[in-house]
């Protein structure tokens, strides 16, 4: 068996693999000899079938297996010896397409190898950890929001104002024809909530019980029901009742509605929850800073195939975010831009770097951590938790999608422990501004 290098350009590698016909024949004979004891053929005792008949009966099938095994062994032997790690599955093609039994096998193998990742001086990385301590104002704001969400409504005499609730019947028509989903009875609508299409709720401000009013609106051009998008509609409304909001009192009774023993216990729960939220947000800000610094200080060649594949995935994802009504791949070819490629290069670079750092430092994701993450995701599908859990267990790709962010976060935490980290007390608004800035970059 002979392997000859034909291209070594950057990370690109190409080789010619030659498997001599004699090696192939020997492998075929060995496989047939191993199988002969179990072969039964009319006219011969079990295990006594002549080799010539075995070759005639099973030769083509065994030859195919022998060819595949020979090439696979040659490839693996080369990778083990060279230490190359292909970025993607190597492309293997048989070059002598007119091959016949008795000829050598000649195949070409091409791949891009993963680059050598340089070491990182963790101590040279300087990070700032934003610290926000939940204060009385933040707890009060959260309590007020809970009270607003727990508000009730009481019958009101007179005209409806913004923030009031109107209970009404309505029938919607387009071009004089009622449409499916365009009518309801005793529907409660809080004016100003934005629950209905733009322009609807504003026209109910000022109505009284027993009033009848035609509300004229136009459906948005991007309305989810395509047959209504952009159409003018008239809703005939009959007002049943007008109600004013009655805010819930911030007291022990409110606390009990939200599962706390009393108001002080609820305040403690809110403070703890806010603290957890602030820490999570601060961690996201610090993680971005860490990744930015790694991107700046570490440099190595990237496999073009990985960057291209990532750019296509980014372009595809962004296109679907802009066109949510289109499902699957039933759409025109999506072109990648320089912006897509630039973002892809950063993702590939940081992905390879974090993977290498994690491997070198024995960072792993435990079974318990995987189970916890899967259970957390499963709760997003009430009533289908078991089915979701079983799907993940049986799907290697889905498991990897769960494991990858866990692994990345653990590597980031490892680097964070080695880096120089300073704490900075900031306000909630400062933290929010820092988080908002992440989306703008």
From Swiss-Prot:
Residues 163-248 form the PPIase FKBP-type domain. GO terms for cellular component: cytoplasm. The keyword Cytoplasm applies. Keywords: Cell cycle, Cell division, Chaperone, Cytoplasm, Isomerase, Rotamase. Its main location: cytoplasm. Signal peptide: none annotated. It is found in: Cytoplasm. InterPro entries: PPIase_dom_sf (IPR046357), PPIase_FKBP_dom (IPR001179), Trig_fac (IPR005215), Trigger_fac_C (IPR008880), Trigger_fac_C_sf (IPR037041), Trigger_fac_ribosome-bd_bac (IPR008881), Trigger_fac_ribosome-bd_sf (IPR036611), Trigger_fact/SurA_dom_sf (IPR027304). One of its GO terms (molecular function) is peptidyl-prolyl cis-trans isomerase activity. Its EC number is 5.2.1.8. It catalyses: [protein]-peptidylproline (omega=180) = [protein]-peptidylproline (omega=0). It is an enzyme of class 5 (isomerase). Consists of 3 domains; the N-terminus binds the ribosome, the middle domain has PPIase activity, while the C-terminus has intrinsic chaperone activity on its own. Involved in protein export. Acts as a chaperone by maintaining the newly synthesized protein in an open conformation. Functions as a peptidyl-prolyl cis-trans isomerase. Belongs to the FKBP-type PPIase family. Tig subfamily. This is Trigger factor. It comes from Jannaschia sp. (strain CCS1). The gene is tig.
């Amino acid at each position: 068996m002979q392997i000859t290098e034909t291209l070594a350009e950057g990370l690109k590698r190409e080789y010619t693999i030659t498997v001599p016909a004699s090696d192939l024949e020997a492998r075929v004979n060995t496989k047939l000899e191993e199988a002969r004891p179990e072969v039964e053929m009319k006219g011969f005792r079990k295990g006594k079938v002549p080799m010539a008949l075995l070759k005639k009966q099973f030769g083509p099938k065994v030859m195919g297996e022998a060819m595949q095994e020979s090439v696979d062994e040659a490839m693996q032997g080369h990778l083990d010896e060279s230490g190359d790690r292909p970025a993607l599955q190597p492309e293997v093609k048989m070059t002598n397409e007119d091959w016949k039994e008795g000829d050598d096998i000649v195949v070409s193998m091409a791949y891009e190898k993963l680059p050598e990742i340089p070491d990182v001086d963790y101590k040279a990385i300087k990070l700032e950890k934003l610290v926000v301590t939940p204060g009385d104002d933040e707890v009060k704001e959260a309590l007020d929001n809970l009270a607003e969400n727990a508000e009730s409504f009481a019958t009101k005499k007179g005209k409806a104002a913004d923030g009031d609730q109107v209970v009404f019947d309505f029938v919607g028509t387009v071009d004089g024809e009622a449409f499916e989903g365009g009518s309801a009875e005793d529907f409660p609508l809080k004016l100003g909530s934005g629950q209905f299409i733009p322009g609807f709720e504003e026209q109910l401000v000022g109505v009284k019980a027993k009033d009848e009013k035609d509300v004229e609106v136009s459906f948005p051009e991007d309305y989810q029901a395509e047959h209504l998008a952009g159409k003018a509609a008239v809703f005939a409304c009959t007002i049943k009742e007008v109600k004013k909001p009655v805010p819930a009192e911030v007291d022990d009774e409110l606390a009990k509605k939200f599962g706390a023993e009393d108001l002080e216990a609820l305040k403690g729960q809110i403070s703890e929850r806010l603290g957890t939220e602030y820490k999570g947000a601060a961690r996201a800000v610090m993680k971005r800073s860490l990744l930015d610094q790694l991107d700046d200080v570490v440099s190595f060649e990237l496999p073009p195939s990985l960057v291209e594949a990532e750019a296509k995935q980014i372009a595809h994802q962004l296109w679907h975010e802009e066109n949510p009504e289109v499902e699957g791949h039933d759409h025109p070819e999506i072109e990648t831009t320089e912006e897509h490629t630039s973002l892809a290069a950063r993702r590939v670079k940081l992905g390879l770097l974090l993977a290498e750092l994690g491997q070198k430092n024995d960072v792993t994701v435990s079974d318990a951590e995987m189970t916890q993450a899967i259970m957390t995701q499963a709760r997003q599908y009430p009533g289908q938790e078991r089915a979701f859990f079983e799907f993940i267990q049986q799907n290697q790709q889905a498991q990897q999608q769960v494991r990858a962010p866990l692994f990345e976060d653990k590597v980031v935490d490892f680097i964070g422990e080695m880096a120089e980290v300073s704490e900075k007390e900031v306000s909630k608004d400062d933290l929010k501004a820092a988080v908002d800035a992440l989306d703008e970059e």
